[in-house]
A protein has these predicted regions:
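Long, non-globular segments of proteins
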Residues: 1-122, 128
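Charged low-complexity stretches with an acidic bias
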Residues: 95, 172, 177-185
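Ankyrin-repeat boundary/"N-cap" motif
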Residues: 103-112, 134-156, 181-194
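Conserved ankyrin/ankyrin-like repeat signature
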Residues: 121, 164-168
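Ankyrin repeat domain, specifically the short helix-to-loop turn at the C-terminus of the second helix
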Residues: 126-132, 167-178
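Short consensus segments that form the blades of beta-propeller domains
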Residues: 158-162
Length: 197
C-alpha cells in the first residue's frame, strides 16, 4: 500500500508516534486529546517547525501566522485549544463537557486502512461491519469514512492521499457510502458532492 504523505505530515506522525494510534490506552477521547496537547506543548517548547505549522492551521489567533507564534509564551491551554479545533471541537471546554465520548475502534482502524490505501483491509472490515459506511467520527467534525477520503478538513496528521484513492472511493460508493454526507469543518458544513465522483 502506498500513499502520498507530505514531509510535514510525516514529521508530525513521527513526533506524535504511538500517541496517534494507541487509542485503547485512553479511557475516553478527552483523555487522549489531552495527551496530544501535552505532546504538542513539548514540540512548541522545542520550536519544531511542523508543530508551529500545525498550530497556524487550527488556533484561531494564529491562523496563517506561524511566524508570530512565540514558543516561550504559547501555553498548554493554547495547545489544548489548538488540538480541540483540529479535532473539530469549538473549544477545549466543549470537548471536556463530553466525558463519555468514546472511540469506535473499528471505525478508526477503517480510516487508517483508507488513508494507507489498504483496499483489501477496507473490503474485509466493511463486509464484516457494513454499518461503518454510515458511522461518523466521534470528533467534532463528525466525518464519515468517505469524508476522510477528501484528505482535508480532518486531523492534520491524517491529511495524506492513498495512491489508489479512486479505487477506494469507487468501492465505498458501490457498497453504499453517501457522498452527500455532511462534515462540520471550516466553520460550516461540507460534503464531497462538489467533487466529481
Amino acid at each position: 500500500m502506498q500513499a502520498y504523505i507530505p514531509q510535514l505530515i510525516s514529521e508530525l506522525k513521527e513526533f506524535y508516534g504511538d500517541d496517534l494510534y494507541n487509542l485503547e490506552s485512553y479511557s475516553n477521547i478527552p483523555e487522549h486529546l489531552e495527551a496530544l496537547a501535552q505532546r504538542m506543548h513539548i514540540g512548541v517548547r522545542e520550536s519544531h517547525s511542523f508543530i508551529l505549522t500545525e498550530i497556524s492551521n487550527y488556533h484561531k489567533d494564529y491562523l496563517g501566522k506561524k511566524e508570530v507564534i512565540n514558543p516561550k509564551e504559547f501555553s498548554i491551554d493554547d495547545c489544548r485549544q489548538t488540538i480541540a479545533n483540529e479535532y473539530g471541537f469549538a473549544s477545549w471546554t466543549a470537548l471536556n463537557q463530553q466525558p463519555n465520548l468514546l472511540y469506535n475502534y473499528d471505525f478508526e482502524k477503517a480510516i487508517n486502512f483508507l488513508l494507507d490505501g489498504n483496499l483489501p483491509a477496507i473490503r474485509k472490515v466493511i463486509s464484516e461491519k457494513p454499518e461503518l459506511l454510515t458511522e461518523r467520527s466521534k470528533y467534532g467534525h463528525n466525518a464519515t469514512l468517505l469524508n476522510y477520503a477528501g484528505s482535508n478538513g480532518v486531523e492534520f496528521w491524517r491529511q495524506q492521499v492513498p495512491l489508489n484513492l479512486p479505487e477506494i472511493v469507487t468501492y465505498l460508493l458501490e457498497v453504499g457510502a453517501d457522498k452527500t454526507a455532511i462534515m462540520k469543518v471550516y466553520g460550516g458544513e461540507f460534503n464531497l458532492s462538489l467533487i466529481h465522483i
